[in-house]
UniProtKB/Swiss-Prot annotation:
Extra remark beyond the main annotation: Plants over-expressing TB1 exhibit markedly reduced lateral branching, but normal propagation of axillary buds.
Start and end residues of each stretch annotated as Disordered: 180-269, 289-331
PROSITE patterns: R, TCP
Name of the gene: TB1
Pfam families reported in the protein's UniProt record: TCP (PF03634)
Protein name per UniProt: Transcription factor TB1
Biased composition (Low complexity): 289-314
Compositionally biased spans, kind Basic and acidic residues: 210-224, 247-269
Organism superkingdom: Eukaryota
Disruption outcome: Increased lateral branching.
Organism: Oryza sativa subsp. japonica (Rice)
Boundaries of every R domain copy: 250-267
A cellular-component GO term for this protein: nucleus
Disulfide bonds: none
InterPro entries: CYC/TB1_R_domain, TF_TCP_subgr, Transcription_factor_TCP
């Protein structure tokens, strides 16, 4: 396949050379079946050209055979075809990963599913919990030391061994919880004790059997038997019932009413003390003001003092009448605790001792007699009401 020298286009190549480059498609042979996708063509070598030919770069490019038309292409494509067929067979069997699906999609999803399945949570009485747990430093050291002594290669086996060895304690806790629930429900103590005994005996028997099995297992493996579990030195106190509050009886109600009456009396007494102290302060202030304005030799000073005393007595009479109409009674003898220096406080004390109008008449007569005389320089003179 050598073109003419300096040929401008491939169309100037002779026909037999063009047929050599692109041969016609032959008919399939029914007698000989070939397994490859390409057929071998038996052709004679081209005759040598009668004209001289010179090599050129364009001719070399055109003369280079195409990879698709190379007769040994079957040998190059056959391994790749076998790989595709094997991948398809693996994909049909469920073990293939590259069976026509990109790795970036299903590979990442499969890896995520595997990671999620490894750390899946479990449903417990307290909700969803993770299967992994974090141990403290001391517990982790003891745990792995026990695992090394037992010769286990997985932590779950060590935990299973611990659960098997503590069956008796677990059953005891379950029986205690059942008895506490029965007590909270209000059942009798005998039934609770009976149930507890019924639960505890099989637990002890089961625990003994478990300990025996564990000891036998330890002896068979050449390991030390586990020590029996000691009884608790300080048993748990029984739980208090929800309805353990005592019901109040008649005696407690009567005591409560008595305490309420005492509080009411104390409140009334403090009210009278406050009133007496206010009146005493007011009377002392008025007396001091009157003493500054007038000399002590003037008899009108005593008149002012007596008039203020009469005013205080009138106010107390009005207050006592209103108290008597309202039904407020003050017990006699309580106001004796009040110590006052003025006449107003003396009037309050007399009113508290009497508690009514009839008992306070003698006190008013005594006050009237004291008002009729006044003292000057250690000498008591009779007070004249008509003195101006």
């Amino acid at each position: 396949m050598l073109p003419f020298f300096d040929s401008p286009s491939p169309m100037d190549i002779p026909l037999y050379q063009q047929l050599q480059l692109t041969p016609p498609s032959p008919k399939p042979d029914h007698h000989h079946h070939h397994h490859s996708t390409f057929f071998y063509y038996h052709h004679h070598p081209p005759p040598s050209p009668s004209f001289p030919s010179f090599p050129s770069p364009a001719a070399a490019t055109i003369a280079s055979p195409s990879p698709a038309m190379h007769p040994f292409m079957d040998l190059e494509l056959e391994p790749h075809g076998q790989q595709l067929a094997a991948a398809e067979e693996d994909g049909a069997g469920g073990q293939g990963v590259d069976a026509g699906v990109p790795f970036g999609v299903d590979g990442a999803a499969a890896a995520a599913a595997a990671r999620k399945d490894r750390h899946s949570k479990i449903s417990t009485a307290g909700g969803m919990r993770d299967r992994r747990m974090r141990l403290s430093l001391d517990v982790a050291r003891k745990f792995f030391a026990l695992q090394d002594m037992l010769g286990f290669d997985k932590a779950s086996k060590t935990v299973q061994w611990l659960l098997n060895m503590s069956k008796a304690a677990i059953r005891e806790i379950m029986s205690d919880d059942a008895s506490s629930v029965c007590e909270e429900d209000g059942s009798s103590s005998l039934s609770v004790d009976g149930k507890q005994q019924q639960h505890s005996n099989p637990a002890d028997r089961g625990g003994g059997a478990g300990d025996h099995k564990g000891a036998a297992h330890g002896h068979s493996d050449g390991k030390k038997p586990a020590k029996p579990r000691r009884a608790a030195a300080n048993p748990k106190p029984p739980r208090r019932l929800a309805n353990a509050h005592p019901v109040p009886d008649k005696e407690s109600r009567a005591k409560a009413r008595e305490r309420a009456r005492e509080r009411t009396k104390e409140k009334n007494r403090m009210r009278w003390v406050t009133l007496a102290s206010a009146i005493s302060v007011e009377a002392a202030t008025a007396a001091a003001a009157a003493g500054e304005d007038k000399s002590p030799t003037s008899p009108s000073n005593n008149l002012n003092h007596s008039s203020s005393t009469n005013l205080v007595s009138t106010e107390l009479e009005d207050g006592s009448s209103s108290t008597r109409h309202n039904g407020v009674g003050v017990s006699g003898g309580r106001m004796q605790e009040i110590s006052a220096a003025s006449e107003a406080s003396d009037v309050i004390m007399a009113f508290a001792n009497g508690g009514a109008y009839g008992d306070s008449g003698s006190y008013y007569l005594q006050q009237q007699h004291q008002q009729d005389q006044w003292e000057l320089g250690g000498v008591v003179y009779a007070n004249s009401r008509h003195y101006c």
